[in-house]
From Swiss-Prot:
Listed CDD domains: NAD_bind_m-THF_DH_Cyclohyd (cd01080)
Record protein name field: Bifunctional protein FolD
Catalytic reaction annotation: (6R)-5,10-methylene-5,6,7,8-tetrahydrofolate + NADP(+) = (6R)-5,10-methenyltetrahydrofolate + NADPH; (6R)-5,10-methenyltetrahydrofolate + H2O = (6R)-10-formyltetrahydrofolate + H(+)
Pfam families: THF_DHG_CYH, THF_DHG_CYH_C
Gene that encodes it: folD
GO cellular component, one term: cytosol
UniProt binding sites for NADP(+): G166, R167, S168, S191, V232
Subunit field text: Homodimer.
């Protein structure tokens, strides 16, 4: 049996069309466009590439994009001042701080300056707390994208055993909580887990978020399981692979996200959806 491929590019296209329609409706109703401010420190080519992708996405959908690139010698105080000013600026609905920051800058203190209502990356402790309590807040985009792939493909989650391999604050932990909120039985595994293969093999849904290429192999996966791969690993030969050994798992699983073209494309649309949601909530709270 060969797994169904959970195609992130196709889903991202559908989501973008839905989001464009929702954004245009917002603009017509409110007379303004949702707006995103990206804050980053100059000098990181990967950060520049990511920013270009976000800018293009905003333009396609109708979101106003502003780029706040700070010089390499930026101090903690300057960074916090920039974020704080954007938090107070009523014309800005979403703030995205590009992480990781260069050495010498404290990301936790910088993130604390983001108004939680504008935290479109879902990284502020306030939004993490809402997620842990099962209350709606702004959700981190990577796990939100993975959930969207599962839900839109009608993958049953209720009562299913999901093993999340990886406990990062940005992907593993929030993904485990999102699955829990959908009534899955969730196990979190990580680098210290004893007999990882056995823990993974017991799962109906396997989520890989470790940053270790090819960690999850076909012999670790229960036949018919659904596999979500958040890994983005660039090999020495330039190939991009996930945390799942696709070639061996594709013959065992019932459904699998490819890398590239799986969770990645959906993640970027989730960011833009958060910008619209943040704008909607901010305008609604002003009207009360």
């Amino acid at each position: 049996m060969t797994a169904i491929i959970l195609d992130g590019r196709a889903l991202a296209k559908t989501l973008r069309e839905e989001l464009r329609a929702d954004t245009q409706a917002f603009i017509q109703n409110n007379g303004i466009a949702p707006s995103l401010a990206v804050v980053k420190i100059a000098g990181d080519p990967a950060s520049d590439r990511y920013t270009r992708t976000i800018r293009k996405g905003c333009e396609e959908i109708g979101i106003t994009f502003t780029d706040h690139t700070l010089p390499p010698e930026t101090t903690q105080a300057m960074l916090e001042e920039t974020i704080s000013a954007l938090s107070f600026d009523r014309t800005i609905h979403g703030i995205l701080l590009h992480l990781p920051l260069p050495p010498g800058l404290d990301s936790a203190r910088a993130i604390a300056q983001i108004d939680p209502a504008k935290d479109v990356d879902g990284v502020h402790p306030y939004n993490a707390g809402l997620l842990a309590m099962g209350r709606p807040g702004l959700i981190p985009n990577t796990p939100a994208g993975g959930m969207e792939l599962l839900l839109r493909n009608n993958i049953p989650l209720k009562g299913q055993h999901a093993t999340v391999v990886g406990r990062s604050v940005v992907v593993g932990k929030p993904m485990a909580l999102l699955l829990l909120n959908e009534h899955a039985t969730v196990t979190i595994a990580h680098s210290r887990t004893k007999d990882l293969a056995a823990v993974v093999r017991s799962a109906d849904i396997v989520v890989a978020a470790t940053g270790k290429p090819g960690l999850i192999t076909g012999d670790m996966v229960k036949p018919g399981a659904v596999v979500v791969d958040f890994g983005v690993n660039v090999l020495e030969d330039g190939r991009v692979v996930g945390d799942v050994d696709f070639d061996s798992v594709v013959n065992v699983a019932s459904a699998i996200t490819p890398v590239p073209g799986g969770t990645g494309p959906v993640t970027n649309v989730m960011l833009l959806r958060n910008v619209l949601r943040a704008a909607q909530q901010q305008l609604a709270s002003r009207h009360h």
